[in-house]
């Protein structure tokens, strides 16, 4: 079973004149297969820094991150990343964008295109596989980014505000898509957002982080993602009195967190 461990992780950024900025301080977090963990907090609380450490884009100043007992020392195919900006290659068509990671790993063309078409079908884009990515809407481009991350069959999906630039209706549609994919794949998901409602809807566990330095101030185990999978009605889930109570509590908590 996949297991991601964040063990006493701190990150210092160096500044001019040798000044140090403590971005993360003594963060401890364990995630296992099927966990959907959402990090929420004010700007500057270290959410993206933490995701970058998990992805292997940077190393902690202190502490260690382990996946299945092995230290994370750099990027790897077992960790897929979806960014706020889709980061697609404009000179490649949709299918070749999805297959890019497989190509870099040496997978033959027939097999990587088979996988690309399979993942595009999962995100509802099988009919646009041959189109240039610049012809797609923002929401469709982000779905291509999700399909590309899934193509390598990672153990962990890292999602850094992937829906932040989308309109409200598209955002809700892709929230539901992400949950359906999570329910089917049962991967570890670590997701960053500034939206309290989005965090409550997606998370099986929600962590609220303090700003400067970033620490985990509160953690909530939540039922709403699984409720959506059971009923398929996002509006019913989000209008439930329990959902609204959590939303108000967490908004108050974020405003009160120093």
Curated annotation (Swiss-Prot):
Its EC number is 7.6.2.7. The keyword Cell membrane applies. It catalyses: taurine(out) + ATP + H2O = taurine(in) + ADP + phosphate + H(+). It is an enzyme of class 7 (translocase). GO terms for cellular component: plasma membrane. Pfam families: ABC_tran (PF00005). Keywords: ATP-binding, Cell inner membrane, Cell membrane, Membrane, Nucleotide-binding, Translocase, Transport. SUPFAM superfamilies: P-loop containing nucleoside triphosphate hydrolases. It is a peripheral membrane protein. Residues 4-236 form the ABC transporter domain. It is found in: Cell inner membrane. ATP binds at residues 41-48. It comes from the Bacteria. GO terms for molecular function: ABC-type taurine transporter transporter activity; ATP binding; ATP hydrolysis activity. The complex is composed of two ATP-binding proteins (TauB), two transmembrane proteins (TauC) and a solute-binding protein (TauA). Belongs to the ABC transporter superfamily. Taurine importer (TC 3.A.1.17.1) family. Part of the ABC transporter complex TauABC involved in taurine import. Responsible for energy coupling to the transport system. This is Taurine import ATP-binding protein TauB.
């Amino acid at each position: 079973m996949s297991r991601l461990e964040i063990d006493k992780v701190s990150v210092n950024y160096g500044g001019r004149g040798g000044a140090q900025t403590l971005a993360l301080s003594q963060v401890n977090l364990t995630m296992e297969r099927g966990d959907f963990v959402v990090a929420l907090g004010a700007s500057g609380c270290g959410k993206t820094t933490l995701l970058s450490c998990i992805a292997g884009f940077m190393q902690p100043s202190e502490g260690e991150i382990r996946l299945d007992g092995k230290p994370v020392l750099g990027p790897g195919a077992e960790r897929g990343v979806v960014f706020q900006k889709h980061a697609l290659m404009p000179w490649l068509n949709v299918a070749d964008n999805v297959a890019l990671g497989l190509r870099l790993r040496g997978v033959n063309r027939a097999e990587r295109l088979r996988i690309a078409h399979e993942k595009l079908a999962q995100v509802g884009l099988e009919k646009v596989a041959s189109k240039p990515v610049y012809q797609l809407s923002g929401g469709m481009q982000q779905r291509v980014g999700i399909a590309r991350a899934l193509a390598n069959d990672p153990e962990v999906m890292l999602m850094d505000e992937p829906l932040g630039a989308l309109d409200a209706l598209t955002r809700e549609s892709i929230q539901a898509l992400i949950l359906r994919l999570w329910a089917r794949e049962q991967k570890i998901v670590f997701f960053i957002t500034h939206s309290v409602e989005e965090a409550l809807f997606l998370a099986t566990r929600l962590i609220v982080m303090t700003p400067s330095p970033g620490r985990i101030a509160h953690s909530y185990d939540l039922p709403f993602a699984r409720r959506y999978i059971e009923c398929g009605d996002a509006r019913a889930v989000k209008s439930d009195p329990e959902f609204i109570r959590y939303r108000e509590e967490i908004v108050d908590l974020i405003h009160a967190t120093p």
